Amino acid sequence: MSDLAKTAQRRALRSSGSARPDEDVPAPNRRGNRLPRDERRGQLLVVASDVFVDRGYHAAGMDEIADRAGVSKPVLYQHFSSKLELYLAVLHRHVENLVSGVHQALSTTTDNRQRLHVAVQAFFDFIEHDSQGYRLIFENDFVTEPEVAAQVRVATESCIDAVFALISADSGLDPHRARMIAVGLVGMSVDCARYWLDADKPISKSDAVEGTVQFAWGGLSHVPLTRS
């Protein structure tokens, strides 16, 4: 076949939508539509969170995460160089949700009892609306890894610091006593919210929050305040 005939044949094949096996035609994207990098990263974090909660860190696999996300494994590794890096990114995202929720709640009022209420409410809201984050932070199966343990400490210590700052500002207590109260309040809020969720929400969230607040306020009402 002459060069002219070959050229005509190739043009005919292109116009008809057909292609020879050896034609240099891009393969279709079998893994889904291409997303902007930030959007893809966010999607991978959501999918990875599901897998880590379902499987635990050790049983979770990068193959499964990539498959659920509809991407190839090399694409996953373009965003996260290892399973540990991915896990830490997932954990960091949930920690930020918890800490920002507590800070925002405490900034909404200057009334001390109401502050207690919104702080307790923030933990119940987090456990209800971000149960994956709750599992990863407070029921973590991988705290033997120093970087993971550090992230978990950030979650609790940041919340304690926020409560401690208000107690210190509003009371005549020395820093050690004020921090002990903050530790107790955060621990009680987490444990009560955890029980409420694990018991399949036996009472309404508002009743659970108010019960926790009443118990805590019984002790806090005896703390000397420099201002109301």
Curated annotation (Swiss-Prot):
Pfam entry (one): TetR_N
Keyword Hydrolase: no
GO cellular component term, pick one: plasma membrane
Keyword Transcription belongs to the record: yes
Region (Disordered): 1-39
InterPro entries registered for this protein in UniProt: DesT_TetR_C, Homeodomain-like_sf, HTH-type_TetR-like_transc_reg, HTH_TetR, Tet_transcr_reg_TetR-rel_C_sf
Domain HTH tetR-type residue range list: 38-98
Regulation: FasR:DNA binding is regulated by long-chain acyl-CoAs (C14- to C26-CoA), which act as effector molecules that modulate the affinity of FasR for its DNA binding sequences and therefore modulate the expression of the essential fas-acpS operon. FasR activity is not affected by mycolic acid biosynthesis intermediates.
Gene3D superfamilies: Tetracycline Repressor, domain 2
GO biological process per UniProt: regulation of DNA-templated transcription
Keyword tags: Activator, DNA-binding, Transcription, Transcription regulation
Gene Ontology molecular-function annotations: DNA-binding transcription factor activity; transcription cis-regulatory region binding
Phenotype of the disrupted gene, per the record: Inactivation of the gene is not lethal for in vitro growth but leads to complete rearrangement of lipid composition of the envelope, with phospholipids, mycolic acids, sulfolipids and phthiocerol dimycocerosates relative abundance severely altered. As a consequence, replication of the mutant strain is impaired in macrophages leading to reduced virulence in a mouse model of infection. The mutant resides in acidified cellular compartments, suggesting that the lipid perturbation caused by the mutation prevents M.tuberculosis inhibition of phagolysosome maturation.
Secretion signal span: none
DNA-binding feature ranges: 61-80
PANTHER family per UniProt: HTH-TYPE TRANSCRIPTIONAL REGULATOR RUTR, TRANSCRIPTIONAL REGULATORY PROTEIN (PROBABLY ASNC-FAMILY)-RELATED
UniProt subunit comment: Homodimer.
Function: Transcriptional activator that plays a central role in sensing mycobacterial long-chain fatty acids and regulating lipid biosynthesis. Activates the expression of the genes encoding the fatty acid synthase (fas) and the 4-phosphopantetheinyl transferase (acpS), whose products are involved in the fatty acid and mycolic acid biosynthesis. Specifically binds to three conserved operator sequences present in the fas-acpS promoter region.
Entry comment, domain topic: Contains an N-terminal helix-turn-helix (HTH) DNA-binding domain and a larger C-terminal regulatory effector-binding domain (EBD). A long tunnel traverses the entire effector-binding domain, enabling long fatty acyl effectors to bind. When the tunnel is entirely occupied, the protein dimer adopts a rigid configuration with its DNA-binding domains in an open state, leading to DNA dissociation.
Protein name: HTH-type transcriptional activator FasR
Organism: Mycobacterium tuberculosis (strain ATCC 25618 / H37Rv)
Classification of source organism: Bacteria, Bacillati, Actinomycetota, Actinomycetes, Mycobacteriales
Protein encoded by which gene: fasR
